[in-house]
């Protein structure tokens, strides 16, 4: 929930130089940039907002202090969220000493907006290669980029200028990185301290995506690690500024493509909150969205478990997990019509009602799946090799969770109670019963146990949703209807949907942690700015810390326990 009026007044009393603002959607503290670090430190240490969630920038194109920067922080004791804002023309002080997660967020802002962070230890680009000359999220940067390089396609080369009058003819294109650019980027990221720098990725089965890791090795011990991101960067946040709210839904499918339904749901709920229409979304749609997201959560965890086990040599579990996962994929395909990129939710409901017989098929699955899960636990949980590879490996304390901005099963594996479904319930999560499993030691083994238990809790949630949906008539609405279509147009295609002026930070509990959306609306059909807070991005930022003084063999184990998806990391 947003920070209360009382909390904001206490901050104002302690820090009289700040301005505070409270509304239903966002609680904000405004401060001059010269006092930013002192303010962040006081809010963290004196008011308990220890968990770093996100930091980014809005380009307002104003003549002075063009960029509005914001920090999203969370108090795990009072369960309050707050935003700290400041303005700048081109530079800000770095907050990396307060939170390591800020270091990665600042690199992203430098990359996308050109903001210089004073005191940043190693300010390099986050997604683009280091010799790139532009900052794509600035408002004066065109959507298609600057087409300055002559790079004709094969057809244009063969037919020459005979194609010059056709719509597909383009003699110039945007610049793409050369091998020389990538070599420079690699050398700029890590300064060798030990014997040899080992490249892992960007295309390797163990990374489960196009992630590029650099290990500085002393024998088989890793002295330092760096991660080069951006191989799957597609400019999703830039695209969001040019798409209607409903049309942007298809891009959420393509971030964490393993759990597209959960991403759909998080975006839809964020826009509904900004519109103020949560109360008119049909109860049937809320239960359907919750049930489908929990099926997707199990689906995601099964993929994680199968590939995790395979990476450590347990082929049997990989085969068992994928057999059950295929059943869920068939259920999802039967209901939504797609297996991977689904786009099932709609602003105001869902795309279509459940087909006849869907609930019976789901009931059949959740009846037999718990037994399968129990059998897998017998195979893995006390297996000597599995325990040896996971116990006391990749240990994270509670303070690490706050410092690195970690969420999801990674945070809960260290005993931090942080689950958006419980803390800020959306859709039907406030109407169903389930427990939040917590670890004790914060190692890879605890993160494994937490995800196993999460699948059991997802079954509980699905059971309750199925029972509730069975009591509902097929004629009950699955899409909200506007009281005044002239002011608010709610349709399946989303055409004509206008969102009022305002801003919001709203998040959902994805299988990989908190998926947050900061939406800034100037009114109209399209958002002015969308900042996506992916759980995978921040969970990955702790990886270099966990790899210090570990063996190369631990690289796969620790990475798998964090469970990043590169589509969500790179966006």
Swiss-Prot record:
<feature type="region of interest" description="NADH dehydrogenase I subunit D">
    <location>
        <begin position="194"/>
        <end position="571"/>
    </location>
</feature>
<comment type="similarity">
    <text>In the N-terminal section; belongs to the complex I 30 kDa subunit family.</text>
</comment>
<comment type="function">
    <text>NDH-1 shuttles electrons from NADH, via FMN and iron-sulfur (Fe-S) centers, to quinones in the respiratory chain. The immediate electron acceptor for the enzyme in this species is believed to be ubiquinone. Couples the redox reaction to proton translocation (for every two electrons transferred, four hydrogen ions are translocated across the cytoplasmic membrane), and thus conserves the redox energy in a proton gradient.</text>
</comment>
<protein>
    <recommendedName>
        <fullName>NADH-quinone oxidoreductase subunit C/D</fullName>
        <ecNumber>7.1.1.-</ecNumber>
    </recommendedName>
</protein>
<feature type="region of interest" description="NADH dehydrogenase I subunit C">
    <location>
        <begin position="1"/>
        <end position="171"/>
    </location>
</feature>
<keyword id="KW-1278">Translocase</keyword>
<dbReference type="Pfam" id="PF00329">
    <property type="entry name" value="Complex1_30kDa"/>
</dbReference>
<comment type="similarity">
    <text>In the C-terminal section; belongs to the complex I 49 kDa subunit family.</text>
</comment>
<dbReference type="GO" id="GO:0008137">
    <property type="term" value="F:NADH dehydrogenase (ubiquinone) activity"/>
</dbReference>
<keyword id="KW-0997">Cell inner membrane</keyword>
<keyword id="KW-0472">Membrane</keyword>
<keyword id="KW-0813">Transport</keyword>
<dbReference type="GO" id="GO:0030964">
    <property type="term" value="C:NADH dehydrogenase complex"/>
</dbReference>
<dbReference type="InterPro" id="IPR029014">
    <property type="entry name" value="NiFe-Hase_large"/>
</dbReference>
<dbReference type="GO" id="GO:0005886">
    <property type="term" value="C:plasma membrane"/>
</dbReference>
<dbReference type="InterPro" id="IPR001135">
    <property type="entry name" value="NADH_Q_OxRdtase_suD"/>
</dbReference>
<dbReference type="Pfam" id="PF00346">
    <property type="entry name" value="Complex1_49kDa"/>
</dbReference>
<dbReference type="InterPro" id="IPR037232">
    <property type="entry name" value="NADH_quin_OxRdtase_su_C/D-like"/>
</dbReference>
<keyword id="KW-0511">Multifunctional enzyme</keyword>
<dbReference type="InterPro" id="IPR001268">
    <property type="entry name" value="NADH_UbQ_OxRdtase_30kDa_su"/>
</dbReference>
<dbReference type="GO" id="GO:0051287">
    <property type="term" value="F:NAD binding"/>
</dbReference>
<comment type="subunit">
    <text>NDH-1 is composed of 13 different subunits. Subunits NuoB, CD, E, F, and G constitute the peripheral sector of the complex.</text>
</comment>
<dbReference type="GO" id="GO:0048038">
    <property type="term" value="F:quinone binding"/>
</dbReference>
<dbReference type="InterPro" id="IPR022885">
    <property type="entry name" value="NDH1_su_D/H"/>
</dbReference>
<keyword id="KW-0874">Quinone</keyword>
<dbReference type="GO" id="GO:0050136">
    <property type="term" value="F:NADH:ubiquinone reductase (non-electrogenic) activity"/>
</dbReference>
<dbReference type="InterPro" id="IPR026662">
    <property type="entry name" value="NDH-1_subunit_CD"/>
</dbReference>
<keyword id="KW-0520">NAD</keyword>
<keyword id="KW-0830">Ubiquinone</keyword>
<keyword id="KW-1003">Cell membrane</keyword>
């Amino acid at each position: 929930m947003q920070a209360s009026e009382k909390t904001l007044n206490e901050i104002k009393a302690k820090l009289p130089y700040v301005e505070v603002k409270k509304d239903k959607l966002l609680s904000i503290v405004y401060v001059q940039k010269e006092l930013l670090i002192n303010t962040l430190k006081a809010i963290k240490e004196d008011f308990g907002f220890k968990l770093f969630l996100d930091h980014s920038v809005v380009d307002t194109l104003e003549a002075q202090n063009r960029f509005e920067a914001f920090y999203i922080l969370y108090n795990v004791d009072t369960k309050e969220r707050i935003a700290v804002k400041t303005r700048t023309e081109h530079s800000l002080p770095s907050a990396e000493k307060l939170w390591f997660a800020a270091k990665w967020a600042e690199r992203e802002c430098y990359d996308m907006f050109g903001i210089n962070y004073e005191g940043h230890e190693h300010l390099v680009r986050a997604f683009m290669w280091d010799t790139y000359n532009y900052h794509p999220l600035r408002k004066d940067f065109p959507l298609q980029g600057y087409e300055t390089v002559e790079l004709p396609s094969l057809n244009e080369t063969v037919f020459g200028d005979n194609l010059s009058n056709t719509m597909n003819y383009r003699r110039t294109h945007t610049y793409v990185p050369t091998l020389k650019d990538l070599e420079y980027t690699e050398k700029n990221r890590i300064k060798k301290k030990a014997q040899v720098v080992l490249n892992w990725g960007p295309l390797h089965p163990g990374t489960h995506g196009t992630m590029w890791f650099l290990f500085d090795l002393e024998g088989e011990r890793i002295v330092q690690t760096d991660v080069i991101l951006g191989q799957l960067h597609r400019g999703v946040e830039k695209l969001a500024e040019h798409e209607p709210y409903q049309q942007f839904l298809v891009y959420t499918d393509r971030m964490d493509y393993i759990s597209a339904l959960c991403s759909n749901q998080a975006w839809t709920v964020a826009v509904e909150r900004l519109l103020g229409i949560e109360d008119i979304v049909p109860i049937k749609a809320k239960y359907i969205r919750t049930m489908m997201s929990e099926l997707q959560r199990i689906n995601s965890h099964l993929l994680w478990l199968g590939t995790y086990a395979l990476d450590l040599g347990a082929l049997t579990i990989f085969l068992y997990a994928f057999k059950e996962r295929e059943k869920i994929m068939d259920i999802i395909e039967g209901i939504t019509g797609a297996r991977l990129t689904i786009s099932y939710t709609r602003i105001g409901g869902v795309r279509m009602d459940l087909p006849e017989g869907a609930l019976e098929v789901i009931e059949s699955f959740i009846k037999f799946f718990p037994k399968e899960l129990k059998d897998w636990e017998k195979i893995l949980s006390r297996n000597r090799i599995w325990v040896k590879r996971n116990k006391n490996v990749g240990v994270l304390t509670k303070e690490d969770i706050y410092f690195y901005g970690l969420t999801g099963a990674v945070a809960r594996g260290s005993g931090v109670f942080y689950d958006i479904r419980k803390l800020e319930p959306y859709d039907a999560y406030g109407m169903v019963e389930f427990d939040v499993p917590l670890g004790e030691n914060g190692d890879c083994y605890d993160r494994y146990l937490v995800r196993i238990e999460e699948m059991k809790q997802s079954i509980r949630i699905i059971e309750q949703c199925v029972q509730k949906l069975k009591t509902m008539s097929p004629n009950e609405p699955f899409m909200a209807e506007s009281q005044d279509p002239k002011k608010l147009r709610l349709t399946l295609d989303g055409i004509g949907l206008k969102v009022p002026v305002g801003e919001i930070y709203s998040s959902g509990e994805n299988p990989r942690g908190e998926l947050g959306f900061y939406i800034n609306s100037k009114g109209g059909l399209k958002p002015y700015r969308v900042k996506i807070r992916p759980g995978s991005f921040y969970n990955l930022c702790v990886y270099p810390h966990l790899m210090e003084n570990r063996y190369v063999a631990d690289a796969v184990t620790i990475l798998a326990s964090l469970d990043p998806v590169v589509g969500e990391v790179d966006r």
